[in-house]
Amino acid sequence: MPGSRIALRHGLIDAARQVTTLGLNKGTAGNLSVRAGDGLLITPSGLQAADLRPNDIVFIDSEGEWRGPRKPSSEWRFHHDILAERPDVGAVVHTHAPFSTVLACLGRPIPAFHYMVAMAGGNDIRIGAYATFGTAELSRHALAAMEGRKACLLAHHGMIATGRTLKAAIKLAVEVEELAEQYWRCLQIAEPEILPADEMERVLEKFKTYGDNAQLPSPPA
């Protein structure tokens, strides 16, 4: 099979199922990719994670071309473009996680209400402007929101999280969703106080060596 790399295919399937188990995606929503040589492997369009088999995973080359029995996820463009533009990124996770999506639909970026926002690479988690799913325009908006960041929200859509590995990208997606829920709950009472920029700079510096051996959270019982 073109672009085989069977271990990466199995790893991507396991990751897609884990994202569903963690409640970050439901049904056929969301998609994941991992860097593979001169291209990427990505989950296909229209299949639930539980039904995925290695041959369903799609290889896309550096030119954005693919072949095989399955079409890639409709969001393959921003996966391809993020991996092409960001050598620090080895995997991309896109979810429609509930609280992240609520904030994205409200046009609410996540500010530095909590120091853990720095896990996403800066002093906020931005929102990429809305564009129709699967378009080059959406990819451009995602890249802009991801500049200097490891994660972002997508207006009226969902969330993107990245990492050097699938494990790291999923861990960050879990963290972003947790922050989104905490921020939403704060907003039910009042606007939370925002940490100053100099404090977030200190946190960002400390995070350069934080969590290297952190374990992925277990799924809820």
Curated annotation (Swiss-Prot):
List of residues binding Co(2+): 75, 94, 96, 157
Pfam families: Aldolase_II (PF00596)
Note on how the cofactor is bound: Binds 1 cobalt ion per subunit. Can also use Ni(2+).
GO CC annotation: cytosol
SMART domains: Aldolase_II
Catalytic activity: 5-(methylsulfanyl)-D-ribulose 1-phosphate = 2-(methylsulfanyl)acetaldehyde + dihydroxyacetone phosphate; 5-deoxy-D-ribulose 1-phosphate = dihydroxyacetone phosphate + acetaldehyde
Domain of life: Bacteria
Listed cofactors: Co(2+)
Gene3D superfamilies per the UniProt record, alphabetical: Class II aldolase/adducin N-terminal domain
GO biological process, one term: L-methionine salvage from methylthioadenosine
EC number, UniProt record: 4.1.2.62
Annotated site residues (Plays a key role in the stabilization of the transition state and positioning the aldehyde component) in this chain: 115, 133, 210
Alphabetical UniProt keywords: Amino-acid biosynthesis, Cobalt, Lyase, Metal-binding, Methionine biosynthesis
EC top class named in words: lyase
Pathway in which this enzyme or protein is active: Amino-acid biosynthesis; L-methionine biosynthesis via salvage pathway
InterPro entries assigned: Aldolase_class_II_sugar_metab, Aldolase_II/adducin_N, Aldolase_II/adducin_N_sf
Keyword ATP-binding: no
GO molecular function: aldehyde-lyase activity; metal ion binding
Active-site feature positions: 75 (proton donor/acceptor)
Disruption phenotype: Mutants produce only low levels of ethylene when grown on MTA. Deletion mutant accumulates both S-methyl-5'-thioadenosine and 5'-deoxyadenosine extracellularly.
Function (record text): Uses 5-methylthioribulose-1-phosphate to yield 2-(methylthio)acetaldehyde and dihydroxyacetone phosphate. Can also use 5-deoxyribulose 1-phosphate to yield acetaldehyde and dihydroxyacetone phosphate. Part of a bifunctional DHAP-shunt salvage pathway for SAM by-products.
UniProt cross-references to PANTHER family, sorted A to Z: 3-OXO-TETRONATE 4-PHOSPHATE DECARBOXYLASE-RELATED, FUCULOSE PHOSPHATE ALDOLASE
Family in the record: Belongs to the aldolase class II family.
The protein, known as: 5-methylthioribulose-1-phosphate/5-deoxyribulose-1-phosphate aldolase
